[in-house]
């Protein structure tokens, strides 16, 4: 497992190679502000080999945040992360490993009949109640997450996962009422609190796509205030003093900056903009005005939540082109480096993930960290 002393030792090994605030606080110690993502690529042995080499190169070069998910590449991404960690010269205590559960995974390759596979492997075996499945493959019920967490530990060949995300919980809102989804999440938070107390995970979070960057009236909106309230209730039920909901993940890049620009969340209690209703009961907060809401990044910062950004270079699209007016404000020798530095410059962001399915990309992406990020005022000025 990652430790405070291990992650700080990793940071110290690189001396002054990187720019200001390249390493940032993240439980239990520090992590790089550029992380390696493992979403892209076909589920093949050849891509496994590329990822293995890329992860090894990243760990050697100054990236100690590795992000994956059980459904990525039919469980192959988790397995290759485990292989690379086992072979790396970096100590396990130096590396923050995060994974996710929510989408039922295939095993090694996509089956000819995905629906039949889900039925035979998960429904017929009583792992998942079909009534809780949304869009045929997504469930956030505690029994399902418990099973997926165990499988992730096995795939990664680890005793502990440093950060475990409930994966795209807003998917449930496509077929279920918000109150029911919040109830399911609270039950799953209780499960994760027990797994945290048992030492199986360090902390937990919510990895999202829509939930925190859309307005409260949107179908897939989730309230951070409500989620934190539900996490506190889950911790109380388990007998834990402080809940373990410490991280959110959301997409953020030059062309998808909603987490900074969209007033999607209720103002935190005690702030000047706070309204009378935090949404603790699971309502969508439709009655709040824009003046009573803040962005997801601002809310997370005020609430003490770490933010990890995904799609930092837009699945490579932004490696080719950034609007000239924005590029002029960003440090970096290449467009990809500028895109990475935009994401990790946003106020409140801890780490920006970049998919690195090939070792050829590692040197360029890591080198983005040798440039200082924008200060808060300079970042704000981009949007003026």
PLM segments and residue spans:
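Conserved, mostly hydrophobic/aromatic
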Residues: 36, 58, 66, 81, ...
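A solvent-exposed, charged loop/short amphipathic helix patch at secondary-structure junctions
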Residues: 116-134, 269-284
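Short, well-ordered amphipathic alpha-helical segments that serve as non-catalytic structural scaffolds
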Residues: 54, 140-153, 188-191
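Beta/alpha (TIM)-barrel catalytic core signal, keyed to glycine-rich beta->alpha loops juxtaposed to Asp/Glu
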Residues: 2-22, 49-50, 55-57, 73-74, ...
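Active-site mouth loops of central-metabolism enzymes
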Residues: 37-50, 129-147, 174-181, 325-331
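N-terminal binding-site loop/beta-alpha segment at the start of enzyme catalytic domains
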Residues: 1-120, 127, 193-197, 383
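Short, well-ordered coil/turn segments that N-cap beta-strands
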Residues: 29-34, 61-64, 89-95, 158-162, ...
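CE4/NodB-like, metal-dependent polysaccharide N-deacetylase domain
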Residues: 144-164, 237-240
């Amino acid at each position: 497992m990652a430790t405070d002393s291990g992650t700080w030792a990793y940071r110290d090994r690189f001396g002054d190679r990187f720019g200001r605030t390249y390493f940032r606080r993240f439980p239990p110690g520090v992590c790089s502000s550029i992380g390696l993502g493992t979403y892209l690529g076909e589920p093949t042995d050849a891509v496994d080999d590329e990822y293995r080499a890329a992860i090894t190169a990243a760990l050697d070069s100054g990236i100690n945040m590795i992000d994956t998910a059980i459904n990525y590449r039919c469980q192959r991404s988790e397995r290759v992360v485990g292989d690379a960690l086992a072979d790396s010269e970096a100590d396990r205590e130096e590396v923050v490993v995060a994974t996710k559960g929510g989408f039922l995974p295939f095993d090694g390759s996509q089956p000819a009949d995905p629906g039949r596979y889900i039925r035979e492997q998960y429904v017929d075996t009583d792992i998942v109640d079909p009534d809780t499945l949304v869009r045929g493959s997504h469930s956030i019920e505690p029994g399902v997450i418990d099973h997926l967490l165990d499988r992730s530990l096995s795939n990664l060949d680890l005793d502990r996962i440093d950060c475990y995300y409930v994966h795209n919980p807003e998917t449930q809102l496509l077929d279920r009422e918000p109150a029911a989804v919040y109830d399911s999440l609270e039950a799953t938070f209780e499960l994760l609190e027990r797994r945290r107390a048992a030492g199986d995970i360090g902390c937990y979070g919510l990895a999202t796509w829509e939930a925190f960057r859309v307005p409260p009236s949107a179908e897939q909106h989730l309230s951070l205030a409500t989620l934190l309230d539900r996490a506190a209730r889950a911790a109380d039920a388990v007998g834990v003093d402080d809940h373990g909901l410490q991280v959110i993940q959301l997409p953020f890049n030059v062309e998808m900056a909603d987490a900074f620009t969209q007033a999607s969340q209720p103002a935190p209690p005690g702030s000047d903009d706070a309204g009378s209703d935090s949404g603790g009961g699971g309502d969508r907060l439709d009655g709040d005005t824009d003046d009573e809401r803040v962005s997801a990044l601002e809310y997370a910062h005020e609430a003490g939540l770490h933010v990890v950004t995904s799609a930092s270079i837009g699945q490579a699209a932004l490696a080719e082109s950034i609007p000239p007016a924005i590029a002029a404000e960003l440090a970096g020798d290449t467009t990809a480096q500028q895109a990475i530095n935009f994401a990790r410059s946003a106020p409140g962001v801890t780490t920006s993930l970049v998919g690195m399915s090939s070792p050829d990309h590692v040197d360029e992406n890591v080198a983005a960290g040798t440039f200082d990020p924008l200060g808060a005022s300079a970042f704000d000025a981009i949007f003026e």
